[in-house]
Every structure is written in C-alpha cells, then in structure tokens.
C-alpha cells in the first residue's frame, strides 16, 4: 500500500481535495449528484463507511493512513477514468431507497420515480385499487420496485432485453423481498409476456411505465465520458431517439385496461416526441425537471393495434 501524502489528515482535507480534483478534471455529473461537492462528500463518506447524511460531526476526524489511501484511490478513479460514482460504490439511491448497481445496467435516474411517490395521482384515482403494473426496459429494476411500493396490492411484471440487466434487477427485487410480487421477463418489450395478459381483458395492466432508451443519435455522439461506461443499448434511441418509444406506444393499447395509463420518460426529447406523436393526446406531467420529461397517455387515446 502506498504511503499517504502528509497534507491529508481529516475528512475535511479529503473532501476539499476531491472537489478540487473533480473540478480540475472537468467531470460530468448526473449519476446521483449534479455537482463536485455533493459527489465528493458522497464518495468520501461511503468509502469510510460513515453515514451518508452526516458530514459535520466527522469533518475534523483524523483518519488512519489506510483510510486515506482508500479514499484517494476512489477519487483518482473518478477523476482519471471518469467512472460514474455509482459504479465505484456499487449502489444508487432513488427517492430514499438504495439499489445495487454495476456496469451491467445504466445508473438509475428517473423522474417517474418521484411521480410514483404519489402513486401517479391524480391520473390513477386510487393506488390501492391498482392490480397490475408493467415496466418495460426495467434495467436494474428500481422503478418496478418503486411501483410495487406505490401500489401495494399490485403484481408487477418487469421486462428487459438484457439478461445481464435482469440479473441485477433480480438482486434488487430479492433485496426488497418482492420476489412474489415482481416477475422478471427476458425479451424485447412485450414479446416475452404471456399472451393471455392481453387476450383476457381481466388480465390487462392498469399501468404501464417505461424509461426506455431515448437519446437521439446527435446527442449520443456528444455524451460525456461518464456515460460511455453505461450500456449503450440502455441509452441509444435511434436517429430521433424515438425508435423504442414508437414501439412501446404502438402496442400498448392491447395490454392496458380500458381506463389504464401509459407513462413514458423521454429526458430532453420532448420536441422529438411531439414531432413523432403530434396526433396523440399527450399529458405532460410536472416533475422537478419541469413538464417536459415524462408524458402520460390514457388507454383510450392510444392507437388501436392491428391483429
């Protein structure tokens, strides 16, 4: 193990160093924090096994040489390799809930999560009456888990094309003890789901949610290095970002109850959504990012499915 540089003795020293190092490296944020200070505090506290919400009492705590070395190693990996913090710590937080993540999945970040805090009300009249939910492009399974918590009487089906992603989703599902309420399906959007779930109207879903790949080709080419560590298939949405969204909307009607809703997150692609689906009655939902990141469509407004 290397000898710790003498200038670093306390938590305060390491946080200050991390902020300087991250600023010097011109890092991009957006995988759990949006600035150098918050990311520095998180990585320092996590590496030292300290409570993530308690910085002040530990600021002037003197650290052992091996603790300093461990923190410096994490800071350098973040600064030089541009690895997202969540991959370094093997965890991500969403609305107070901790989830396991690694490089097999995109780092979870979704405004649908905050909408689930209120059970999608008022668009869902009573969350306790929701009996079934489908999440497409589940990735690490975070939204499926938040949906199960928001709709306590619902069964949740979660689908992903990546077997690796589903392995991570299984870890999270099992960590929350939801293996009897969340079923995982490996396949392309609706394809792996049992056909009786649309043939029998009683089996159709009350809610479908999706945070699909939606980054358009131009934006993909300009993504910061941090995003290059994530699976490309979880980000890239084709020329206008709408390749997967078109397919989700195109078949959603047959899988939804007559009074069901489809909720889709599209990041900064509102203009492309409106260009592609201008004939549909889209309801843009207010989130902490404004009203241009998540839209809802009532089942009655969705296009009919042939066949």
UniProtKB/Swiss-Prot annotation:
Any one GO biological process: methylation
Membrane spanning residue stretches: none
Keyword tags: Methyltransferase, S-adenosyl-L-methionine, Transferase
Keyword match ATP-binding: no
GO molecular function, one term: nucleic acid binding
GO (cellular component) term, any one: cytosol
Catalytic activity: L-glutaminyl-[ribosomal protein uL3] + S-adenosyl-L-methionine = N(5)-methyl-L-glutaminyl-[ribosomal protein uL3] + S-adenosyl-L-homocysteine + H(+)
Protein function: Methylates large ribosomal subunit protein uL3 on a specific glutamine residue.
HAMAP family assigned: L3_methyltr_PrmB (MF_02125)
Protein name, entry field: Ribosomal protein uL3 glutamine methyltransferase
Annotated source species: Burkholderia pseudomallei (strain K96243)
Gene: prmB
């Amino acid at each position: 193990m290397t000898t710790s540089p003498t200038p670093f003795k306390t938590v305060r020293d390491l946080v200050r160093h991390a902020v300087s190092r991250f600023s010097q490296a011109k890092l991009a944020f957006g995988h759990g924090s949006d600035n150098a200070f918050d990311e520095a505090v998180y990585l320092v506290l996590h590496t030292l096994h300290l409570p993530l919400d308690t910085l002040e009492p530990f600021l002037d705590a003197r650290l052992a040489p091996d603790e300093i070395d461990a923190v410096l190693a994490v800071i350098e990996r973040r600064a030089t390799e541009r690895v997202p913090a969540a991959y370094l710590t093997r965890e991500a937080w969403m609305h107070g809930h901790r989830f396991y993540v690694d490089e097999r999945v995109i780092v979870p970040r979704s405004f649908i999560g905050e909408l689930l805090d209120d059970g999608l009300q008022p668009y869902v009249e009573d969350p306790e009456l929701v009996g079934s939910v489908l999440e497409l492009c589940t990735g690490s399974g975070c939204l499926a888990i938040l949906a199960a918590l928001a709709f306590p009487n619902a069964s949740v089906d979660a689908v992903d094309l990546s077997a690796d992603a589903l392995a991570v989703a299984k870890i999270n599902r099992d960590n929350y003890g939801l293996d009897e309420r969340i079923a995982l399906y490996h396949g392309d959007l609706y394809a792996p789901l049992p056909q009786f779930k649309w043939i029998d109207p009683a089996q159709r879903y009350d809610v479908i949610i999706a945070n699909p790949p939606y980054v358009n080709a131009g934006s993909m080419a300009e993504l910061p290095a941090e995003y290059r560590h994530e699976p490309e298939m979880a980000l890239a949405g084709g020329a206008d970002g709408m390749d997967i969204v078109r397919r989700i909307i195109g078949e959603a009607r047959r899988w939804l109850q007559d009074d069901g809703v489809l909720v889709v997150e599209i990041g900064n692609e509102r203009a492309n959504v409106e260009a592609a689906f201008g004939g549909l009655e889209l309801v843009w939902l207010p989130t902490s990012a404004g009203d241009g990141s998540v839209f809802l469509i009532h089942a009655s407004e969705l296009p009919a499915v042939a066949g």
